[in-house]
């Protein structure tokens, strides 16, 4: 059965839209887009469309690819102090001459809609209230929408990034799952993935997960977005894995829409916190 991220996001977003219309002012998101990366432009367009449809305000700061570090830092500091701005998002990747880690650390963690700031990462790992990274949050929202049990399940995550793998592992742990994280140095990977009740692929390698790596009846979550022969494909060989999986996310229309959905919910949460202060 498909885990339909597009359909789920539409339903959850509609519920959020109703909440937003009763707010005294619109939650506002500032997006910083540096350079002309076509994939980044596409992602930003999706975020803009979703937020606008929800009654939220979005402003995109288009910056030249050759912009210097200090200029980006100055923009972030300006947005940090603007009380009319509730969320700030630095669209990744950015040009290599810029320090993305430092720029993310400059964003006020109370406006960190992506959940990448070290403060929000720390709050997650201390099991305290904070903004969760959007892709892991979107995955959890999707599994919950389909009432997929998590407690007591063996979750195997392929990929250990700070954006997906590491925070997602903690979110599963907090739901009482048994979690195994695998990566490029893991030996005998198929023998591990085949034990998974829930298998998450987040490595950026097209069709990496094959049928022989998946247990019959497993739930398969494909985070990958890879362009092959002008088509988008995931990290999972969908055609051959889908028949043996109990649930599986497609690419596209799987995790992607849920990431944007989670971003919108994060912006709403940031708005509520800031308006209380």
Swiss-Prot record:
One of its GO terms (cellular component) is cytosol. It catalyses: (6R)-5,10-methylene-5,6,7,8-tetrahydrofolate + NADP(+) = (6R)-5,10-methenyltetrahydrofolate + NADPH; (6R)-5,10-methenyltetrahydrofolate + H2O = (6R)-10-formyltetrahydrofolate + H(+). InterPro entries: Aminoacid_DH-like_N_sf, NAD(P)-bd_dom_sf, THF_DH/CycHdrlase, THF_DH/CycHdrlase_cat_dom, THF_DH/CycHdrlase_CS, THF_DH/CycHdrlase_NAD-bd_dom. NADP(+) binds at residues 159-161, 184, 225. GO terms for biological process: L-histidine biosynthetic process; methionine biosynthetic process; purine nucleotide biosynthetic process; tetrahydrofolate interconversion. One of its GO terms (molecular function) is methenyltetrahydrofolate cyclohydrolase activity. Its EC number is 1.5.1.5, 3.5.4.9. It holds the Pfam family THF_DHG_CYH. Pathway: One-carbon metabolism; tetrahydrofolate interconversion. Gene3D superfamilies: Leucine Dehydrogenase, chain A, domain 1 (3.40.50.10860), NAD(P)-binding Rossmann-like Domain (3.40.50.720). Keywords: Amino-acid biosynthesis, Histidine biosynthesis, Hydrolase, Methionine biosynthesis, Multifunctional enzyme, NADP, One-carbon metabolism, Oxidoreductase, Purine biosynthesis. Catalyzes the oxidation of 5,10-methylenetetrahydrofolate to 5,10-methenyltetrahydrofolate and then the hydrolysis of 5,10-methenyltetrahydrofolate to 10-formyltetrahydrofolate. HAMAP family: THF_DHG_CYH (MF_01576). Belongs to the tetrahydrofolate dehydrogenase/cyclohydrolase family. Homodimer. This is Bifunctional protein FolD. It comes from Acholeplasma laidlawii (strain PG-8A).
């Amino acid at each position: 059965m498909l885990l339909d991220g597009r359909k789920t996001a539409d339903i959850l977003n509609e519920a959020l839209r109703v909440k937003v219309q009763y707010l005294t002012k619109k939650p506002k998101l500032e997006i910083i887009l540096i350079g002309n990366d076509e994939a980044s432009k596409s992602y930003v367009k999706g975020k803009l469309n979703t937020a606008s449809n929800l009654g939220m305000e979005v402003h995109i700061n288009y910056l030249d690819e050759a912009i210097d570090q200090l200029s980006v830092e100055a923009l972030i500091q300006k947005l940090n102090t603007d009380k009319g701005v509730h969320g700030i998002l630095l669209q990744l990747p950015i040009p290599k001459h810029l320090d993305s880690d430092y720029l993310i650390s400059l964003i006020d963690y109370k406006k960190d809609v992506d959940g990448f700031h070290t403060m929000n990462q720390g709050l997650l790992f201390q099991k305290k209230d904070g903004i969760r990274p959007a892709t892991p949050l979107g995955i959890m929202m999707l599994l919950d929408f389909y009432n997929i049990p998590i407690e007591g399940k063996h979750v195997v995550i392929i990929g250990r990034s700070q954006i997906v793998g590491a925070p997602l592992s903690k979110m599963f742990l907090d739901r009482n799952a048994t979690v195994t994280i695998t990566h490029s140095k893991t030996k005998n990977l198929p023998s591990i993935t085949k034990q998974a009740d829930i298998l998450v692929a987040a490595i950026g390698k097209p069709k990496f997960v094959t049928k022989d790596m998946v247990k019959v009846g497993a739930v398969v979550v494909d985070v990958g977005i890879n362009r092959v022969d002008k088509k988008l494909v995931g990290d999972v060989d969908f055609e051959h894995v889908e028949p043996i999986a109990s649930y599986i996310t497609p690419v596209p229309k799987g995790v992607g829409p849920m990431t944007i959905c989670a971003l919108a919910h994060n912006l709403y949460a940031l708005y509520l916190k800031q308006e209380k202060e």
